[in-house]
Amino acid sequence: MIQVLNLGHVDYTTAQQLQTTLVDLRKRGVIQDTLLLLEHSPVITMGRNAKQKNIVASQEILAQRGVELIECDRGGDVTFHGPGQLVGYPIFDLRSLNPKIGVIEYVRRIEEVLIRSCGDLGIPTTRVEGLTGVWTVNEPQAKIAAIGVHISRAVTSHGFALNVTTDLDYFKLIVPCGISDKPVTSMQHELGKSLTLEEVMPVITRNFGFIFKEQVLWLESLNDLLPTPEDLPARAPETLRRLHEDDLHLG
């Protein structure tokens, strides 16, 4: 079973804190495999292999554009998250899958989910040998989705970022994923029309169920995932507790 939760708009730091909590709960068997779907405010993230030279813009320009700069523990180099981009964070225990899989197969499966989803929505995409992510088929090949993961004791965090209606000018602030010879694109650019994240989410979710051979269950709120505040760590960040309390109040 894969539980799916649409968190809407969440800042990157809060999402990191939530992932840390959920990874701990998944390791302890408190929750099942969970897929978080969300959208971030403008932020450049630096993965474990990030090179400072791949941030082209100065701190002043980033501040003017309202773009945060945050280091994180995912794999990969530098990437951008922001409005119009569908971000997915699977919190999966790879040992619970049948058969169990390793990190390379896990990343290949996420790529396949994205390739199938883009195809379902009218955009032919593929892999590029030697590179991670999903790319358009037509020349010049452009990256439409980035993938960067972290795995701790077989439990995954971080995940993918699919450009739906993302403002591609933001990617001029960096060398995306350290790849200078291939452009970045979006679903809107490829289709010549706009899609909402809410239109894309069910397609992504359906393909997660198909590729990982699991049933999918949509949750209404974080309250359904964390039934009581006691499930949060004793010293959970205030932003995370507030996010949970907001869901409780909505209920």
Curated annotation (Swiss-Prot):
Keywords: Acyltransferase, Cytoplasm, Transferase. It catalyses: octanoyl-[ACP] + L-lysyl-[protein] = N(6)-octanoyl-L-lysyl-[protein] + holo-[ACP] + H(+). Residues 29-216 form the BPL/LPL catalytic domain. The keyword Cytoplasm applies. Its EC number is 2.3.1.181. One of its GO terms (biological process) is protein modification process. Its main location: cytoplasm. Signal peptide: none annotated. It is an enzyme of class 2 (transferase). One of its GO terms (molecular function) is lipoyl(octanoyl) transferase activity. The active site is at 177 (acyl-thioester intermediate). GO terms for cellular component: cytoplasm. It is found in: Cytoplasm. The record marks 143 as: Lowers pKa of active site Cys. The keyword Transferase applies. Substrate binds at residues 74-81, 146-148, 159-161. Pathway: Protein modification; protein lipoylation via endogenous pathway; protein N(6)-(lipoyl)lysine from octanoyl-[acyl-carrier-protein]: step 1/2. In the reaction, the free carboxyl group of octanoic acid is attached via an amide linkage to the epsilon-amino group of a specific lysine residue of lipoyl domains of lipoate-dependent enzymes. Belongs to the LipB family. PANTHER family: LIPOYLTRANSFERASE 2, MITOCHONDRIAL-RELATED (PTHR10993:SF7), OCTANOYLTRANSFERASE (PTHR10993). Catalyzes the transfer of endogenously produced octanoic acid from octanoyl-acyl-carrier-protein onto the lipoyl domains of lipoate-dependent enzymes. Lipoyl-ACP can also act as a substrate although octanoyl-ACP is likely to be the physiological substrate. NCBIfam families: lipB, PRK14345.1. This is Octanoyltransferase. It comes from Koribacter versatilis (strain Ellin345). The lineage of its organism: Bacteria, Pseudomonadati, Acidobacteriota, Terriglobia, Terriglobales.
